[in-house]
Amino acid sequence: MVKVEVLGMILAGGQGSRLYPLTAKRAKPAVPFGAKYRIIDFVLNNFVNSGIYAIYVLTQYKAQSLTEHIQRYWRFGAFLEDHFILLVPAQMYRYEELGPVWYRGTADAIYQNLHLVHNHAPKAVAVFGGDHIFKMNIRHMVEYHYDTRADITIAAYPVPVAEATRFGVLQVDEEWRITEFQEKPEEPKPIPGRPDTALASMGNYIFRTEALFELLEADARDETSAHDFGKDVIPRALREGYRVYAYDFHRNPIPGQEGPNLYWRDVGTLDAYYEASMDLVKVVPEFDLFNPEWPLRTANLFSPPAKFVHETGERVGRALNSLLAGGVIVSGGTVRESVLFRRVRVNSYSLVERSVLFDDVEVGRYCRIRNAIIDKNVKIPPHTEIGYDLELDRARGFTVTPEGVVVVPKGYRF
């Protein structure tokens, strides 16, 4: 195989149980987001926009829709050997050594595919999660990794100390070399000189290739290990004196974007997913989908334009402060602060507010929907209300989140 300088390895096998029912039939990275994308698209765009084109995507849980999406729409062609995005399903590649086991953790997923790393002989390996919403110039992080002569560089997100108990926290010295790793500590340690701020690990890593091999081979031999980067591999690296540095995500430069890079969301719960979706419909969104210098590629399905029809009395087709994909028809209804995916239809006299409607949802006449996430292929009968009577919504079998968001599963029939 052809040699590359930086090899990308994306961990996309997550079950995403806290996103159920959106993950009932798909992996977490395959969950739709932002009217036309899937969650995996954002990290893939980060690699491609950073000029890193040799990428493996490691899959495991309910990967069919994710596989189809990447195989169909993320293709470089056949003429550049160092330009590829290839799927790597869990396949018991080390069966003779480990026995009949699938990926046992994030570190084990990479360990079981070290032969791919060896084949490309990269200078550095970028191990990133496939389930976050963010923009990142990964090349800038790689250069920082080289400049510090690090064995491992961890992307870090500064957070208020009071919020840091939810994350793995990195303790650094004056040069941002990591001295300690705390997994969801009760009393997080702040950044030197910034007593109100702690460094949260984003779970994205750059490894010197030799260090990656050494650490993963040692971890595989450890029968007490959970084979997880955050819980096992990084603490081992610190104990054994490896040079481990933190990279300040806020200082990551994005072409066409002014100021610090502030937006990173782990959409690992239904409420977090909903909140991130609502971020997109603000007049000045925290996460900008419209930056031409940082294009966000995804499936090009050649949908027709969105369409708004009828303007008679109360029968007015309109959408306000919303994101609408191609093929949407708002036929005499009103859409406010919502995200509508492809081929959604909102019929006359209906109101959709602060909701996310996936592909091929149809809202009948005189419906009222608010604070809802409705998965694909749901036909809502006329005069239906969703999000107004939560006990009724629960009785229908819908999921109601702690924040009161109603989630209608894929293909639900009324």
From Swiss-Prot:
Example of a GO biological process term:
glycogen biosynthetic process
The alphabetized UniProt keywords are: ATP-binding, Carbohydrate metabolism, Glycogen biosynthesis, Glycogen metabolism, Nucleotide-binding, Nucleotidyltransferase, Transferase
* Keyword Ribosomal protein included in the entry's annotation: no
Q: Does the keyword Nucleotide-binding apply?
A: yes
Residues annotated as binding alpha-D-glucose 1-phosphate are Y103, G168, E183, K184, S201
Cleaved signal peptide residues: none
Tell me how this protein assembles. Answer: Homotetramer.
Its biological purpose is as follows:
Involved in the biosynthesis of ADP-glucose, a building block required for the elongation reactions to produce glycogen. Catalyzes the reaction between ATP and alpha-D-glucose 1-phosphate (G1P) to produce pyrophosphate and ADP-Glc.
Please report which protein family the annotation says this sequence is part of. Answer: Belongs to the bacterial/plant glucose-1-phosphate adenylyltransferase family.
Q: What is this protein called?
A: Glucose-1-phosphate adenylyltransferase
List the source organism.
Answer: Thermus thermophilus (strain ATCC BAA-163 / DSM 7039 / HB27)
Q: What is the lineage of its organism?
A: Bacteria, Thermotogati, Deinococcota, Deinococci, Thermales
